[in-house]
Amino acid sequence: MLGGSLGSRLLRGVGGSHGRFGARGVREGGAAMAAGESMAQRMVWVDLEMTGLDIEKDQIIEMACLITDSDLNILAEGPNLIIKQPDELLDSMSDWCKEHHGKSGLTKAVKESTITLQQAEYEFLSFVRQQTPPGLCPLAGNSVHEDKKFLDKYMPQFMKHLHYRIIDVSTVKELCRRWYPEEYEFAPKKAASHRALDDISESIKELQFYRNNIFKKKIDEKKRKIIENGENEKTVS
């Protein structure tokens, strides 16, 4: 049995040490949990340019990716890659694709690229693994269901990392056009550059518009405005 004074000092020391580390551990654990929950709310924005929309024969020729938080703030810009495809496939594209991909310089860039589809998937998968937890963050974009079809087929490991749900800005657009036609007239118009990174940036800006002008304000924001208005009325009176 420990002697009184020595024992009490040792016990106090052990207890104090554990108490301090225990509290710090709780704080660090809480911070880690909050960070994990925050990361789970992120959105994985993707845009593809393809040789066409036929999933049986067409291929991905450009892909870009951005990560935003739940408030649509851009947190990270991922790879923006042009993927090599055979000239025969490019020559068989529709007139629309030949015109727009030719005008944007994408066709020429594809011919000059040395990046394979497998290399591209590895780059994008590495990026989203660094930025998002597995299986929790949804794919986001404009008419992103079309992109998803190609990603499911050609980049299955990338898609396996994401949540099965998607956030499609075009759905919000169509609802806004029907339910809020006056506000819809002020929605940002797409420049139609038909380049992946530009299209993602436009999609994020468009959803920001709908959020700010169509979706109702958060309760806390409403309360703040009510308080501010009340203070202003007191000042005026």
From Swiss-Prot:
Keywords: Acetylation, Cytoplasm, Exonuclease, Hydrolase, Magnesium, Manganese, Metal-binding, Mitochondrion, Nuclease, Nucleus, Phosphoprotein, Transit peptide. GO terms for molecular function: 3'-5' exonuclease activity; 3'-5'-DNA exonuclease activity; 3'-5'-RNA exonuclease activity; magnesium ion binding; nucleic acid binding. Mg(2+) 1 binds at residues 47, 49, 199. Changing residue 47 to A: Loss of 3'-to-5'exoribonuclease activity. Residues 1-25 form a transit peptide. Residues 43-207 form the Exonuclease domain. Highly expressed in the heart and at lower levels in the lymph nodes, brain, lung, liver, spleen and thymus. It is an enzyme of class 3 (hydrolase). It comes from the Eukaryota. Changing residue 178 to A: Disruption of homodimerization and loss of 3'-to-5'exoribonuclease activity. The modification N6-acetyllysine is found at residue 173. Pfam families: RNase_T. It is found in: Mitochondrion intermembrane space; Mitochondrion matrix; Mitochondrion; Cytoplasm. Mg(2+) 2 binds at residues 47, 147. The record marks 53, 96, 164 as: Important for dinucleotide binding. Its cofactor is Mn(2+); Mg(2+). Belongs to the oligoribonuclease family. Homodimer. Homotetramer. This is Oligoribonuclease, mitochondrial. It comes from Homo sapiens.
